[in-house]
Structures are given as structure tokens and as C-alpha cells.
Amino acid sequence: MERTIGIDAGGTLTKIAYFNKKKLLTFEKFYSHEQHKIIDWIKNNNGIKQICITGGKSKLLQQLLTGSYKIIELSEFEATLAGVQFILKEEQHTINNFILTNIGTGTSIHYVYNEQYIRAGGTGVGGGTIMGLSKLLTNIDHFEDVIPLTKVGSRKELDITVGDIYGGILSPIDNNLTASNFGKAAITESNNSSSDILATVQGLVGEVVTALSLQFAETKNIEHIIYIGSTLCNNVQLQHIISSYTEYQNKTPIFLQDGGNSGAIGALLHATK
């Protein structure tokens, strides 16, 4: 274990980044409410001397850290942007101006111009929404259990599409677009499967986040939208919802391989530069 680690203590997940003995970038992930596991992991790696920490739960985690650690604090978006720029270079993307949409517990959206960034806005709709509605509607409360079900679920029995409204009449927009998320639930009597409900929840979140990102991109005439966040990790269905809607509006979606670890990567790089 190297002497320095970067920690992104988010609302739902805490991510840790470090370089292992082979100098390879390595990650650990914990639920943020399981702080004892995070502390135990740090204590069990005796070589750690310096910790750069960011994220909404960083203060709380710092209070639990005992020992002779050098603690460096870094603002959340400064860490995230540094991590994103590192990954972009690693993946050989040459993009200077883009919208950065970070889908965490909620969603934050920034304009990025070279090294400068401005917060465009955000929404409370995000990964926390997926998990909250999943728990309320299906009693499934682990992200790892939700994702496989969204792959086999269908939104056809719950969402109202433009085509449903117009029937056989020519509509002014694509018939496949969603007119109302969960709209059919109020007008039909059916026992929907957990997989259909979860697929529809994820559709709602994906479309809300994408629509907001597209509005900001259109306002500033920006082509590329980079979507990051742990909510996208191994979540092929959500990525498909976001990418298809983004491309439909003639923008270019980009998903980074380790985008969910951007904050932890940025914190690590800040402490080791």
C-alpha cells in the first residue's frame, strides 16, 4: 500500500483511490453509512500517512479518523474535474468544452471550459431516487439487486408514450418518446412485476437527468455531454437510456470507464502532485 490515498465520501457511497505496489490505480468502495468498515480498512493498511478527502460526508469521516494522518481537504467539484480530466487523457479523448453531469445520490451539472468550470444546476433526481423508489415500490434496497432486474424489465405497461396518445394519427414528434413516466399506472389495472417497475423507475431518472443536461448543452451550444457517477457503474440499461436520448437531440454522450471514481482519483492526484 502506498502512503497516500484519495477519498470521495459521497452521500451514498465512499470511494477510495490509491496506487498499489505495482503503481496501478486501484479502487475500493463502501456504503457511506458503514463508516466503521471504511475506518477499519484505513487502519488495516498501516502504510497510509496522507489522506486527501472530498465529498459531502468528508467532515463526518474526518471526525472518526484517529492517528497521525496528514489530512488534506479538497472541494468536491475540483476533485471531480481533476479526476475526469485524468481519465479523459487516459482514454485519449481531446475535449476541452463539455457538459459534465455527475449522477450520484442526486445529480449535479457543470459547464467546463478548458480548466474553468461553472455550475449550471442540478436536480434531486439521481441514484438516490432509483434506490428510494425501488425500496418503496418493490422492497428491493440493494443496487446490486436492482440492476439485473432493470435488464429484463419492460416500461411498456407503465409509461405512456407519444404513440399511445396519438394512436394511428401522425404525431409531431417521435412516437417512441415518453409522454408520461408511470402514466399507465393510473389508468390500467395490472399487477406489474418488480422488473417492470424498476425498469420504469430507471427510465424516469435517466430521462429527467438527460433532459436537464440537454437543456444546458443547448443553451451554451456545447456538443459533448460527459456522464459520470457510481449510478452508471455496470448499469448498461441506464447508459442506453441516456445515450439514445442524448443522440436523438444531436448531442454526443460520453461515458468514462472509471467515471464513478472521478472524485477519489482527483483527490489522490491532488495529494501526490
From Swiss-Prot:
InterPro entries attached to this UniProt entry: ATPase_NBD, Type_II_PanK, Type_II_PanK_bac
Decide whether keyword Iron is in the record. Answer: no
**Any idea where this protein resides?**
Cytoplasm
Which EC number(s) are documented for this chain?
Answer: 2.7.1.33
GO terms under cellular component: cytosol
Subunit structure comment from the entry: Homodimer.
Q: What is the protein name stated in its UniProt record?
A: Type II pantothenate kinase
- Protein's organism: Bacillus cereus (strain ATCC 14579 / DSM 31 / CCUG 7414 / JCM 2152 / NBRC 15305 / NCIMB 9373 / NCTC 2599 / NRRL B-3711)
